[in-house]
Amino acid sequence: MARILGVDIPNDKRVVISLTYIFGIGKSTSQKILKLANIDENIRVNDLADEQIAEIRRVALNFVKANGEKLQLEGDLRRTVAMDIKRLMEIGSYRGIRHRRGLPVRGQRTKTNARTRKGPRKTVANKKIETR
């Protein structure tokens, strides 16, 4: 497995797909990185030369988005997302409250469904009717 930006990317897949295993790189960013590095996106990772892997590393580290910002990847991006969620919870916004309660944040229904966010069902038993 080739190691790029601290992530082992799979050898048996095409380069354009393998780069998406890095947190913060999707398919379109992967295509842009490969275009800047002058590497065909249909090549498999195990067919890449060491110089090509080094070029992908260099381009990915120095990649600048269309708005002029540097691309955040892996740990930095995870930290930024976690801090954003923490900030929402601290200021007490609606989204922060939903995060704190472990409920869906983006307006989904919760009467039914939302099991991924709420966890497994907590069954409540009916009260027994006392007979004399």
From Swiss-Prot:
One of its GO terms (molecular function) is tRNA binding. GO terms for biological process: translation. GO terms for cellular component: cytosol; small ribosomal subunit. InterPro entries: Rbsml_uS13_C, Ribosomal_uS13, Ribosomal_uS13-like_H2TH, Ribosomal_uS13_bac-type, Ribosomal_uS13_CS. Residues 101-132 are annotated as: Disordered. Residues 101-125 have a biased composition (Basic residues). Gene3D superfamilies: 1.10.8.50, 30s ribosomal protein s13, domain 2. It comes from the Bacteria. SUPFAM superfamilies: S13-like H2TH domain. Keywords: Ribonucleoprotein, Ribosomal protein, RNA-binding, rRNA-binding, tRNA-binding. HAMAP family: Ribosomal_uS13. Belongs to the universal ribosomal protein uS13 family. Part of the 30S ribosomal subunit. Forms a loose heterodimer with protein S19. Forms two bridges to the 50S subunit in the 70S ribosome. Located at the top of the head of the 30S subunit, it contacts several helices of the 16S rRNA. In the 70S ribosome it contacts the 23S rRNA (bridge B1a) and protein L5 of the 50S subunit (bridge B1b), connecting the 2 subunits; these bridges are implicated in subunit movement. Contacts the tRNAs in the A and P-sites. This is Small ribosomal subunit protein uS13. It comes from Ureaplasma urealyticum serovar 10 (strain ATCC 33699 / Western).
